[in-house]
Amino acid sequence: MDATFPSQRNITTRPAPDRIRREKCKLAKRLRRQVGQAIADFGMIEANDKIMVCLSGGKDSYTLLDMLLQLRAKAPVPFELTAVNLDQKQPGFPKHVLPEYLSSIGVPYHIIEQDTYSVVTRVVPEGKTLCALCSRMRRGALYAYAETQGFTKIALGHHRDDMVATFFMNLFHHAKLSGMPPKLRSDNGKHVVIRPLAYVSETDIIAYADAREFPIIPCNLCGSQENLQRKQVGVMLKAWEKEYPSRIEQIARALGNIRPSQLADQSLFDFLALGRHSNTPLPNAHAWLAGDLANDTAP
């Protein structure tokens, strides 16, 4: 029989309020440090930047906006933040949630209304995931708005685990070592995209969003299934992290610790220059293998 008194059981099973507050403060401090470090490492924010924060209503983008607001309060340089959401006219989308939240915290915002949902559902065959085309159309709409409004940076809520998952997606399905960089210039050269959550784990974001009680909008309103390939990679990474804690962190660090001479990309390292003698060039191996070498006397 359990001889523990009820009051004693409550003490041992319920975290004390002070302890909960301390844990929340530690979590917020860790996220601020990681986001600040990413901003500094990659030069994400400059003086007088006009930053468009893409806000979907999910845990990642809420955390991104919250962190940038906290860091701006103590930043050594001034910069502007504007939250922008794309209303894609998905059925059941709660249009009131973001305006009410953003107004309550005093953040300037704009809602772009563009019916990409109808286009995607019409073009994509039934049973196929809508995510890829939906993402491209969403990106196009956001980039177009950023250009018309003169934003200098576009901030996205991708985190460390997203970056690692994208690396493996490209490795497994596209035979290339590439991922999701913390900072990039768009293909058309008009936009600089930043990912301030590049050092933050998804686990911490989930805990932080829960602690802050953000009004989360689900991302499955369209009824589309998650991309199967990405889902498989996610399952793999979660299994690794469970069996080998910190493995995802190690992989993320490796993405910034490249050794071109230890790989096989000829565009990154001049392997042909590694002849037996420094001033003796190697023969044209491609021509030789094709049988076109001028002095090839083989029968």
UniProtKB/Swiss-Prot annotation:
It is found in: Cytoplasm. Belongs to the TtcA family. Pfam families: ATP_bind_3. PANTHER family: AMINOTRAN_5 DOMAIN-CONTAINING PROTEIN (PTHR43686:SF1), SULFURTRANSFERASE-RELATED (PTHR43686). [4Fe-4S] cluster binds at residues 131, 134, 222. The thiolation reaction likely consists of two steps: a first activation step by ATP to form an adenylated intermediate of the target base of tRNA, and a second nucleophilic substitution step of the sulfur (S) atom supplied by the hydrosulfide attached to the Fe-S cluster. This is tRNA-cytidine(32) 2-sulfurtransferase. It comes from Xylella fastidiosa (strain M12). Binds 1 [4Fe-4S] cluster per subunit. The cluster is chelated by three Cys residues, the fourth Fe has a free coordination site that may bind a sulfur atom transferred from the persulfide of IscS. A motif (PP-loop motif) lies at residues 56-61. It comes from the Bacteria. GO terms for cellular component: cytoplasm. Keywords: 4Fe-4S, ATP-binding, Cytoplasm, Iron, Iron-sulfur, Magnesium, Metal-binding, Nucleotide-binding, RNA-binding, Transferase, tRNA processing, tRNA-binding. Its cofactor is Mg(2+); [4Fe-4S] cluster. Its EC number is 2.8.1.-. InterPro entries: Rossmann-like_a/b/a_fold, TilS/TtcA_N, tRNA_Cyd_32_2_STrfase, tRNA_thiolation_TtcA_Ctu1. NCBIfam families: PRK10696.1. Homodimer. GO terms for molecular function: 4 iron, 4 sulfur cluster binding; ATP binding; magnesium ion binding; sulfurtransferase activity; tRNA binding. It catalyses: cytidine(32) in tRNA + S-sulfanyl-L-cysteinyl-[cysteine desulfurase] + AH2 + ATP = 2-thiocytidine(32) in tRNA + L-cysteinyl-[cysteine desulfurase] + A + AMP + diphosphate + H(+). Catalyzes the ATP-dependent 2-thiolation of cytidine in position 32 of tRNA, to form 2-thiocytidine (s(2)C32). The sulfur atoms are provided by the cysteine/cysteine desulfurase (IscS) system. Pathway: tRNA modification. One of its GO terms (biological process) is tRNA thio-modification.
